[in-house]
A protein has these predicted regions:
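Conserved ABC ATPase "signature" region
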Residues: 4-7, 11-29
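Helix N-cap at the start of a conserved alpha-helix in ABC-type nucleotide-binding domains
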Residues: 69-71, 100
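Hydrophobic anchor residue at the start of the ABC signature
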Residues: 47, 75
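ABC transporter nucleotide-binding domain
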Residues: 77-143
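A short, proline-enriched helix->beta-strand linker immediately N-terminal to the Walker B motif
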Residues: 52-56, 85
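Short loop immediately C-terminal to the Walker-B catalytic DE motif
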Residues: 64-65
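Catalytic Walker B motif of ABC-type/P-loop ATPase nucleotide-binding domains
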Residues: 58-61
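Conserved ABC ATPase signature
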Residues: 33-37
Length: 143
């Protein structure tokens, strides 16, 4: 249905759907309604729907949120495979995900774009470590 909405020819839809279902590892769930899929499986299905039909601009809002590490990596590989020739705008809270997938990374804070650039640029400009600030308050507890 989504492929048809995006203008795919009827003869190409079945093959494209089969390929996507294989790519998101949902072959054994082909005949299940989406409401019966797990949260991770629903996310995989959503990513497949986003890419089917050859869309040139794709928005993905935290596509791997709530997934375990292996499922996240699986989706990452799929995104790498299908992103060529497309503009993919992806939101994430995982810097490793942005680093692996992003050609350009934008960092937002309080609803505003704080900085933008390649992973290398951001690491050179802002560093790769963490800052830890510890403040000790005098508790005036008698010894």
């Amino acid at each position: 249905m989504f492929a048809a909405f995006k203008g795919m020819n009827g003869s190409d839809i079945d093959a494209a759907v089969r390929t996507m279902i294989e790519d998101v590892d949902l072959v054994d769930k082909t005949d299940y309604p989406a409401k019966d899929l797990s949260g991770g499986q629903k996310r995989k299905l959503s990513v497949a729907i986003a890419f089917i039909g050859g869309s040139k601009l794709i928005y993905l809002d935290e596509p791997t949120s709530g997934m375990d590490t292996s499922a996240r990596r699986y989706i990452w590989e799929m995104l790498k495979k299908y992103k060529d020739g497309k503009i993919v705008v992806l939101t994430t809270h995982f810097m490793d995900e942005a680093d692996f997938l992003g050609d350009r990374i934008g960092i937002m804070g309080e609803g505003k774009l704080i900085c933008c650039g390649s992973s290398v640029f951001l690491k050179n400009k802002f560093g790769v470590g963490y800052n830890l600030t510890i403040v000790k308050e005098n508790t005036n507890i008698p010894s």
